[in-house]
Amino acid sequence: MFSVSHFCSGSLMMSHTLSSLRDLEYQGAFVERHIGPNDVEIAQMLRVVGYDSLESLTDAIVPEKIRSTVALDLPKGITEEEALAKIRVIANKNRVFRSFIGQGYYGTHTPKVILRNVLENPAWYTAYTPYQAEISQGRMEALINFQTMCADLTGMEIANASLLDEATAAAEAMSLAKRSAKSRSDLFFVHDAVHPQTLELLRTRAEPLGIVLRVGTPEEALQADVFGILLQYPDTFGRIGDHRVLADAVHARGGLVAVASDLLALTLITPPGEWGADIVVGNSQRFGVPFGFGGPHAGFMACRDIYKRSIPGRLIGVSVDAAGHPAYRLALQTREQHIRREKATSNICTAQVLLAVMASMYAVYHGPQGLLRIAWRTHRMAAILAAALRGAGLTVGEYFFDTLHIVGIDAVAIHCAAAAAGMNLRMIDNAQLGISLDETVTRSDVVALGQVFGVQVDVEALDAITADALPAGLLRSSAFLTHPVFNTHHSEHELLRYLRMLADKDLAMDRTMIPLGSCTMKLNATAEMIPVTWQEFACIHPLAPAVQWSGYRQLIDELEAMLAECTGYDAISLQPNSGAQGEYAGLLAIRAYHRSRGEERRNVCLIPESAHGTNPASAQLCGMQVVIIKCDRSGNVDVDDLRMKAEKYSDSLAALMVTYPSTHGVFEEAITEICEIVHAHGGQVYTDGANMNALVGVAKPGRWGSDVSHLNLHKTFCIPHGGGGPGVGPCAVKAHLAPFLPKTLPLPGDAAGLPVQGTQEAKVGMVSAANFGSASILPVSWMYITMMGAAGLRKATQVALLNANYIAKRLAPHYKTLYTGRHGLVAHECILDVRPLEKVSGVSAEDIAKRLIDFGFHAPTLSFPVAGTLMVEPTESESQQELDRFVDAMIQIRGEIAAIEKGHLDPEDNPLKQAPHTAVQVMASQWGHAYSRELAAFPLGVLHHAKYWPPVARVDNVYGDKHVMCACIPVEAYKEKEDSEIQHLIEEDASRC
């Protein structure tokens, strides 16, 4: 008789002695699932690197001064099943009411085909931002559908590929207007009926930039000397205003008109682009994305074509590939922070791609007629309810789309009656209520809403006699969504196959490792994702009364405590919904702290030249002066230069922004000295948390002298990247900065449902539209930390360090690692310097990146932080087999470069310069290259077993930026190319005959 004793090193070890029940109840199963290499592989890789244990390797890499001497004070890890049971108990504490609060958030039905095949599909949610165009054609097509949808519905000429939320988009619109308007005024006028969260973000953004806000009615804006104006259309109370005269007046004085709008409403009412708007922003949430207690949702911005080089966020454009076929790419990237740094149009990096894809597919699935039916039904329900209330003597707004504004009532009593019936209304004040209907509303909902007011609603009878409540002069007459993509995929089979076709074009982590340096593309475990779609998390309105989200409260409190323990900080805000917004929040906290001490003069931010582009861009948004610090030959912060500049700017020094480990992939020995220098001159130390995956369980920034960090839950703590968002960028601070974390909106909190303030008045405004940012994906990080436990988190960090050093060591005979730390080791990533190879062969880092596609790999980070290099970050989730596959590909590529050097391959017509190679090219009747098809497509034998074929050849970036087109490709563009190719084949066959 025998029993399973234990699992060891991937092999089942048998013992003839009975194991204890405690041994069989193995709690470390998830850790072994998350960490790629098993113990045998770890031992083998350690031998390659030259160490006998993870502990000895960690001691060799991490400076002793900053190493944690005690384990994380977190519980032991638990199994997936136990964690799911535990979070189910938390979720059940939330109470899902029917929410008619509105204020920018509306109920929606997520089509199940989109839920299963986009939101729950790792082919979509594990992809990265589409910097590598050739392996991102599928999601870029989905995003260009999103851009076309937004541009069509708003009546504008161009739209971006998503922003973080509507309020952030409005703040970006204000900045765009300031940059682009002819007026030199510093005054920005804000409609007094914008959503409250939008006004809060405008206030946060305006003050550091020297912009003066004035809030008032559209009539008051007629005579204002402004550089821009923001209108809400329909407004937060549901009114649909005619703003044509105002738009003309603003334009006459050199200002720009920005409008916050609603995509569903714009199917019925005149789009802002047709009555004078220059910029339109909004939220696509009601196109199939749940409330999620505030997010994530895809905001958007559309504008006139003349502002395309100033619009923030990513733009998908159309170019051509090397074969002349249409191909998508990121357009006009020189606007963005990773290139323009403090001169960028915005600090935005991560946006909301996954949610934009969902919204675009909602429009594709329903098409223009389906959207019209949803919009008219929503409006009809609102009109019927309004008629019933008016019939009972209540005062309701005259014109509206979906939102009723009821005045002159006992709002408290009615609000309480609605809550007792399981419904949430918007209480504006003691005498005013708002009711916003949506596509989920039923006839019984309308009857129940009437009963709350003591009114009997006969839906059928009222439908027969009630007129619509849209203003006749503002009805939409223009067509929208006319492209075939919105008029083809309306059956589930058609959409299912369209989604599969798009996903098959791309490389995501369900196919291959994505070794992007500074991006931490680690496992997004399925168990972590499961709670996200539970209705107890997905269906809570962000402005619901606090008694309805006690489960969220517990989860948020526990996650904040976990993150504080991992970082050594004292307080956390989960409001920032991207890393860039976390940076922004941290710098605002520093700014407010200095001002609270009467040191307004402190506005200089020191930033190393190696920093991520969001650092200087965020500092600029806070009104800070950016001063660059040099790096030494080893890639470290030049301490002498730092000391000199800290002394020079001693009276005005606000902060130092430093990434740790550095963006050069090393643990700098002088980090504590760096912090001391900055503190000695009155500054605060901001540690960018982008590389926190090298620190968890090993070192805590809050303990070595750092005052504030942002974290990337979409990197270190396993929220998926989603192809470019969502993300969560918590701001973590020491105690003295805690009072300066972002404020929150008042929420209905007492028994009567009256708005109440928090226990402490915040001194810094909101940085995201919702109090807890992208709250519905916080369960992902909670699950990860809970399942890993203290020991698992430390081991994950150690294996991340090991994997990076293993790659560097194995590639050392072939590629130089640009920077190393102590003992010739790197941190969790390494920079491969291919510049010497380019000098002798002409092969660039970009050529290597494109060639890796032929091997089935997403490229490492290209030309950051050093131009002409490749930065590799494998993370702890990749097995030795996958690491070896990558190493073998890189060695093969080095061999091809050597063949060019020796003259065995042509300097131009070689597989690197011509990469990537499509199936169409390889199988064409003619092969015009000086190398074989086999070398092009199957440079390694393993590729015969599993081969990824890129859908396009190398994309022409120059053509794309010279011929900017950011909407769906006309079908004729494909047809013309196909016709010409067919004609060529006919002629070729004829010549053979």
Swiss-Prot record:
Record keywords, A-Z: Oxidoreductase, Pyridoxal phosphate
Enzyme class: oxidoreductase
GO biological process assignments: glycine decarboxylation via glycine cleavage system
A Pfam family it matches: GDC-P
Sequence positions bearing N6-(pyridoxal phosphate)lysine: K715
Annotated disulfide bonds: none
The keyword Coiled coil appears for this protein: no
Enzyme Commission no: 1.4.4.2
Catalytic activity, as annotated: N(6)-[(R)-lipoyl]-L-lysyl-[glycine-cleavage complex H protein] + glycine + H(+) = N(6)-[(R)-S(8)-aminomethyldihydrolipoyl]-L-lysyl-[glycine-cleavage complex H protein] + CO2
GO terms for MF: glycine binding; glycine dehydrogenase (decarboxylating) activity; pyridoxal phosphate binding
Description of how the protein assembles with itself and partners: The glycine cleavage system is composed of four proteins: P, T, L and H.
Protein name per its UniProtKB record: Glycine dehydrogenase (decarboxylating)
Gene name linked to the record: gcvP
